[in-house]
Amino acid sequence: TVCGHRRDLSAVDAQAVLALCRGNQVKWELRLSYNLLVRGEGEDLVIVQLSPPPGPVAVTPGQPAAFGEWTVTLGAEPGEGDSYPVSLPEKASLTVTSWKSADRMTLPDSRGPRSLKRLCADAGFRPWQRDALPVLRVDGIPAAVPGVGADAAFAPQPGGPAVFVTFTKEDGNEQ
């Protein structure tokens, strides 16, 4: 049971833990899905529930918004980090949240919408990394995710208004 709900770890997670348990390392640490951290020290195995991702955070153009280890900004110029040009409707509700299983995005030049889970996997994110990613939402719809891209529905039109959404990871480490 994770966070009061029955959850199944993936076979990949289980295989990774078993491989580390059977290995020669005396101390090791592995992050898994559902904000779980597994630590091995000698013959001891400890599973820790990490803090969940933060709840929704409102985003205002020109003001940085903190989301876990990430800072999300909307500005006139691209910033340091992953920046994507987007066209935002006036008076839209702008928030940053974690991903949801129903999220779908259509990336530019793609053949149609795909699940955010699949897009994150294709971008090389492990499940625990995906769980910590900020998702910029426009009126609740996923618009941009660092390392994945911006939804084609929010692509600026030539000569039209645009802002840049920039995602910066605080610790400076790659995902």
Please provide the spans of the model-predicted regions.
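AMP-forming adenylation/ATP pyrophosphatase catalytic core
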Residues: 1-175
